[in-house]
A protein has these predicted regions:
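Charge-rich alpha-helical segments
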Residues: 1-109
Length: 109
């Protein structure tokens, strides 16, 4: 599924774990995102703290609207974003949807 198609979706309650093939297909549409353990993660770099925090606030807005919240590690010029569906015990379509929405915030095509 393409990045724009993923980003256009909304999260669904009680999403099941993604099968490996579907996870691999979705990851192919998410530039720079990695599957590690039971999560998707990516680091985003910025020129300064102001831009870093603006991105964090934008991610918070998306997470609130989707009711799907990432773990964030905030640094001076970097944000590490980790999505996992804890209730499902790993990665679901909701994680891919939110990763695509976050990717769109960062300005990827």
């Amino acid at each position: 599924m393409a990045l724009a198609a993923l980003a256009a979706q909304d999260c669904r309650p009680r999403a099941p774990l993604l099968p490996r093939a579907e996870l691999a297909q979705n990851l192919a549409a998410l530039p720079g995102w990695k599957h590690a353990g039971k999560a998707l993660n990516k680091s985003f770099a910025f020129d300064d703290y102001y831009r870093t925090m603006a991105f964090v606030n934008a991610v918070a807005f998306v997470a609130h609207r989707q009711d799907h919240h990432p773990d964030l590690s905030v640094h001076y010029n970097r944000v590490d974003v980790v999505f996992s569906t804890h209730d499902a015990g790993g990665v679901t379509l909701n994680d891919c949807i939110c990763a695509a929405k976050v990717e769109s915030l960062a300005g990827s095509p």
